Amino acid sequence: MSHVELQPGFDFQQAGKEVLAIERECLAELDQYINQNFTLACEKMFWCKGKVVVMGMGKSGHIGRKMAATFASTGTPSFFVHPGEAAHGDLGMVTPQDVVIAISNSGESSEITALIPVLKRLHVPLICITGRPESSMARAADVHLCVKVAKEACPLGLAPTSSTTATLVMGDALAVALLKARGFTAEDFALSHPGGALGRKLLLRVNDIMHTGDEIPHVKKTASLRDALLEVTRKNLGMTVICDDNMMIEGIFTDGDLRRVFDMGVDVRQLSIADVMTPGGIRVRPGILAVEALNLMQSRHITSVMVADGDHLLGVLHMHDLLRAGVV
């Protein structure tokens, strides 16, 4: 394309708004295609014993990849297969237990129509998403989902715009309808997103990140305040637990308690930890979610908390541990 000068006064915002208006109109019309065929497609996918295999060429392929990823992360096992690669061996990934979703706006993708006889021979259920109910793919499908649009947002009518948006939204409608039908929960979602922020919040538990063993700051009730302070500084958690030989909790002493001791104006050299500790103390169970511990710590304005089974000390959790784990 040769260099073109920008037209004086060209309004980019208006051009963008025109696209949104056209695509909004097309999506509103899509509602009529959420019909009995949509129900049949959902039922085939719901009862599928294998995986939902999505296919598409070009822009439809890009939409198909996103569709498969959305299905997979919302409780419907799925993957994308490129039709060209399927014709050269990758079709071996498809079994009669699977369901195939083939996407083509024209419904005449030669790469896909070439695969249909084989899919039929394998008795693989076929759902086709096209913009033309009279197309070859629509007629060959066990279930046809229509995504016909009045016009593309591209003024030339060439670049897939409204049609790809409609297809993407139809895929989202399938995914979310199935999600609801399965009773899919946020915890289920987290299992397929362990590396994300949501996964960390819904999967990570206190016992995954707490300090244990020699890392736990603790002294006996008979210890001097000086010895307790040394333990606080050695373990660097801003606190120490006071417990007996069996690690049964008797109290806690934090850097906040130390400030209060100084405010008392007493001779700290003469004090035992029993004189200044807070009896009992807040503790959490090791099996609770890390985000639950975070909420507790924030509500109580504390930076560390004991982890215990009843009165038996198991570990200590500090706010820094939650930060490092990405929970905060």
From Swiss-Prot:
Completely inhibited by 10 uM of nickel, copper, cadmium and mercury ions. Inhibited by zinc with an IC(50) of 1-3 uM. Metal ion inhibition may be a mechanism to control activity in vivo. InterPro entries: CBS_dom, CBS_dom_sf, GutQ/KpsF_isomerases, KdsD/KpsF-type, SIS_dom, SIS_dom_sf, SIS_Kpsf. Optimum pH is 8.4. It catalyses: D-arabinose 5-phosphate = D-ribulose 5-phosphate. Changing E111A: Shows 62% of residual activity compared to the wild-type. Involved in the biosynthesis of 3-deoxy-D-manno-octulosonate (KDO), a unique 8-carbon sugar component of lipopolysaccharides (LPSs). KdsD is not essential in the KDO biosynthesis and can be substituted by GutQ. Catalyzes the reversible aldol-ketol isomerization between D-ribulose 5-phosphate (Ru5P) and D-arabinose 5-phosphate (A5P). The record marks K59, E111, E152, H193 as: Catalytically relevant. Residues 210-268, 277-328 form the CBS domain. Keywords: Carbohydrate metabolism, CBS domain, Isomerase, Lipopolysaccharide biosynthesis, Metal-binding, Repeat, Zinc. The keyword Isomerase applies. It comes from the Bacteria. One of its GO terms (biological process) is protein homotetramerization. It holds the Pfam family CBS. Its EC number is 5.3.1.13. It comes from Escherichia coli (strain K12). This is Arabinose 5-phosphate isomerase KdsD. Pathway: Carbohydrate biosynthesis; 3-deoxy-D-manno-octulosonate biosynthesis; 3-deoxy-D-manno-octulosonate from D-ribulose 5-phosphate: step 1/3; Bacterial outer membrane biogenesis; lipopolysaccharide biosynthesis. The gene is kdsD. Residues 42-184 form the SIS domain.
